[in-house]
Amino acid sequence: MATARVEYIAPWWVYWLHNLPHVDFSLQRESGDFNPKDPGYQQTLLFVALFIALCAAVNLLFVSGYLICLCCCKKEDETETKMTSSCCVTWTAAVSGLLCCAAVGIGFYGNSETNDGVYQLTYSLDNANHTLAGIDSLVSNTNAKMKEDLDQHLFRLNEIFAARGDYIQSLRFMQQMAGNIIQQLTSLPNWQGTSVNFSEIARNASIIEYYRWLSYLILFITDVVICLVTCLGLAKKSKCLLLTMLCCGLIALMLSWASLALETSSAVGTSDFCVAPDKFILNMTPDQITADVVHYYLYCSQSQRNPFQQALTVFQRSLTTMQIQIQGLLQFAVPLFPTAQKDLLGIQLLLNTSESNLHQITALLDCRGLHKDYLEALIGICYDGVEGLLYLSLFSLLAAVAFTAMVCAMPRAWKHLAARDRDYNDVDDEDPFNPQARRIAVHNPNRGQLRSFCSYSSSLGSQASLQPPAQTVSNAQAAEYMNQAALFGGNPRYENVPLIGRGSPPPTYSPTMRATYLSMNEESPNIYSNVFPA
């Protein structure tokens, strides 16, 4: 198998984050080596978060200054800029909503990538923990069999073979081989502390990741709801919704900056680990595990010597020697001492079980299994995990920009709605042509209507409050009006529909139209004499 350095290569974004300046609170450069217990290194990560917090403060100051200036500025002539302001608010809200939706989409992808990376890490840690716990279980089981069960069988056989010195010598030799096996098993590393650490890390990582994933999911949904409700408030021109969403937008803006600080500092710290993970693991290895063993699992090279080879070889040879001795006693001693057969078969079964345990221990101690888990954990946290954190950082940045634009646009929408209400209410209540009078006329059809000034009947004056003038209109004039209506409209009729009932003001005539109408009146007798002959 190739070395870990060939199989695992940190991605470019890890090196990019690792090469960012590591500065402590005194503005002094610190080492970028991952060491979370070092106070200086902790300050470098906190400095990244504080720098983003400073950017958030500048952003909030800008938004606050903009809102104050917008509220304190003098009222200008809004008639010329009403359409421009409305269009600007609409486009700002639309772009902010689209930007927020794009940010949420990026955030969903980043959240999923980070979750996959942490899941791969915990899965690999659980596999490694299972392997190490299996080694400890097999070693302790084999030691117990060699110390207790074998001693009981040998004690009874010593009593049975007391008269035969050669058989007693064989039993003592097997006792010596069992001691060698116990000694070699004791020399193997005790993985109990390491497996407990792996189990604790995996459990804590799973719990933290669950709440992190759930928190971001709630944040995504909240951002989308704020954008949708803001658009709804603009569409319905609701001041209450706009005011509520203004407060929610400010809260979402602060949450976006806070998440950006957390994600960036976490990405920088994880990248520092991913650049040189072997160095950190060597420094954190418990004292009972030697550096040779750690190197064996970290690099897993075929050219590297197996640190367990000698112990396993002695174990195998001792078992083989004991099995040969038991075979000889079964062949030669059982015919003379039939009562010894049960204990000899018990020792043979114990040796067969120990040999099976030896094969399992050899397979579990091989570097390929644990090294595979190690590489999968690195790929999960350094590829998917850091990549997901970068996408989440991009989400937070875009969301901050979107909510900044949205918060700045909502007061202008408020002013536009207020100006619209003032224009709507600034009308004469006695004006029969204002919108309110038109609505009343539509909803109250039984109300007395004013007669049209242009209709034939109203020109005679039909209202009771007005004194009608003397009747000067003849039948010929009525026929003349009907014929004019026939010429211009196609059908002779009286115009009996009041203009006010239609919701339109009385007509006005330009001088040109009046001259044209008078000239047509002068020529009308000739035309009417042809149309209606006497």
From Swiss-Prot:
Keywords: Calcium, Cell membrane, Chloride, Chloride channel, Disulfide bond, Glycoprotein, Ion channel, Ion transport, Membrane, Metal-binding, Transmembrane, Transmembrane helix, Transport. The gene is ttyh2. This is Protein tweety homolog 2. Disulfide bonds join 274-382, 300-367. It comes from Xenopus laevis. Residues 1-44, 109-213, 262-388 are extracellular. The chain crosses the membrane at residues 45-65, 88-108, 214-234, 241-261, 389-409. It is a multi-pass membrane protein. May act as a calcium-independent, swelling-dependent volume-regulated anion channel (VRAC-swell) which plays a pivotal role in the process of regulatory volume decrease (RVD) in the brain through the efflux of anions like chloride and organic osmolytes like glutamate. Probable large-conductance Ca(2+)-activated chloride channel. Forms cis-homodimers in the presence of Ca(+2) and forms monomers and trans-dimers in the absence of Ca(2+). It holds the Pfam family Tweety. Ca(2+) binds at residues 113, 116.
